[in-house]
């Protein structure tokens, strides 16, 4: 028997992570509370909050208070991120010269967003700073681009671990740790299922992949590179999701990770997706629990 019955893996996707909150609202209403949680990127943020206080309404209020605070670095950059403007920053950093594209971003530059914005957000959202202060077992996933390996954290500095998991390559400065260079967990584990697969009997994954890819029209060099990387990431995600016992995939409207102005709609779409699945999910959970109970009784029987 494994240490926990129910595990929950929360995928990464920036603003699309609002859908996690909607799913968790339905779970709480139906007394579905995981015993172990894993999170990548925004999934790590929400997972950490839930592991401290399993109250989705509280989580939503914390995000709303953060977004409405005009003094935050995040708030000052929000206008830049609306309407996909943020997504075009890299495209605007290319210059056409003699029918060729030359990237004119400085060779020493490793980020667009300062790590300070991530740290500020986490400091506001998380009342506790260490894993040991959480009430549900929790694992955070990041990626080491030196080795290509997943990095998993479950002890010590909670805020630092989540910040590493949120370091989107090319956008947020990576963390150097000895020889390691740590970036977003989504690079190696878009939805961190394998991270807790051996820790629980039944694993639910919430997938917030972008969904159907929009059509490209005369893509430039950078758009082709980005699309190729996105396709590779999606294939990795599809393979990974096969290891979950149950997958919920809310409609995230194909939104870019930076579209935080769509947060309320994404929360509602998470609710809708979970409500569609909840009856079947509860049935499967009941069957699995009954099976495990019978197995436990069988092996504990004195022959």
Describe the residue ranges of each PLM region:
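Patatin-like phospholipase
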Residues: 1-40, 48-303
